[in-house]
Amino acid sequence: AELAPIAHRVKPTANPFPAQLRGHASAQQTAAAVEAALQSPGALLADGSFAAEAGFSEATELALALTAAARWLQAADARGLALEPVAARLELLLGTGRDLFFTLAKFRAARLLIASLLDRAGLTAVPRIHALETLSSKTTLAPWTNLIRLSVETTAAILGGAQSIALRGHDAASGTASPEALRLALGAACILREESHLGVVADPAQGSAALEQLTEQLATAAWALFQEEQRGAKDGSGLVAKGDAESAPKFADAVTRRRESIIGVTEFPDLGERAVAPAAPASGPAAPRRWSQPVEAARAAVEATTPGARPIVALHVGDPSEKLRPRIAFAKGLFATLGYRAIEVPLGSDSAATVACLCTSDALLAEQTPAFIEAAKSAGAHHLFAAGNPGDAAASLQAAGITDFLNLATGLAPLLQRAAQLTSETK
């Protein structure tokens, strides 16, 4: 594969459709851009990468790329142009994804889908497929971990058949990659190409039952979405609306419930880490989304209330046995995602923290809650959490003064939902 690590975008090509779908260009402007592109030489880009940036499913991204390819052919046919030369100018652009196997299968499915589309039109062209490193998986906290994500995503795209890859740098989530980030991206690309020789073997995933099945599933789902769009709006707007409706709750649920681990953000956060300033979040249809953004924003808000100091949460330990250590570590990790430094105190002790959490066994939770509430409130705590599963006693414990419960089922949701309240009363 040809790697282009220092480019922020693939080589200039005609690519008018994403701007229209995102509401940045009118139908008249898009039509004029299409007319100009068809009359000039150069590649015609069938772009699905913006869907990956917005967190759409792999099938939706593939369907949008197919829709763009079909729009180019339909526009050329409407103008009486020969379709074979136009098809020869088509190039696909797909985004990388955080899942190695889904990304690999997506690029394999793309080749099958575009070949099927052109074959049905009686065309023999074989379009090139490009990959763009997307920022949806990148973090502003612990940005060095993005180097691992970048390498995994690039590997998946190459093994899936991408013929060129544009890398953006590990700190590109700030809006502009630094020279150092571009240098490291170049190094990663060179290692994958010159030392790992990933682009030498054609379709190395061929024969893997799991990957063959996943490729077929993605191709089938994408083709069904593409056909549905052709029966409707035909321009991709239906796919964008569907993708937006699905991706927002998917992002929120995956992160807040910690079903998707983000190293350095939701798992193993470093309290000494300084985040790079994030780019301003976009809005509108198919707006780019980053998985880590809600947690990073909540942590930044908490830290802003205590400049020069670290906010503290007091963990009231009600069971000194070693069996409780995993629960204490779990609570520490949850609060650390919002920038809190946890201190352990015996149950009933005074502390200067405005946030407190009871850490005890489920069997002792109801019994020890009154002593915890009395001690925490007398110390000035405004928000009282309990780590554990209260079962049927949840309602009565909350009526007594517990703000919420922290466990595997709730994940980060109680803390993120109350981030504004926590920051307003943090001292």
Stretch-by-stretch model annotation:
Residues E58-L62, G97-A109, T134-I148, G175-A185, ...:
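Short glycine/threonine-rich loop-to-helix capping motif typified by GTGT followed
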Residues L66-A69, L93-A177, A181-A185:
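Glycine-rich anion/phosphate-binding loop at the beta-strand->alpha-helix junction
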Residues Q163, G199, A224-V313, D319:
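Intrinsic disorder at enzyme termini
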Residues E273, A280-I343, A399, D404-F405, ...:
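ATP-dependent carboxylate/acyl-activation modules
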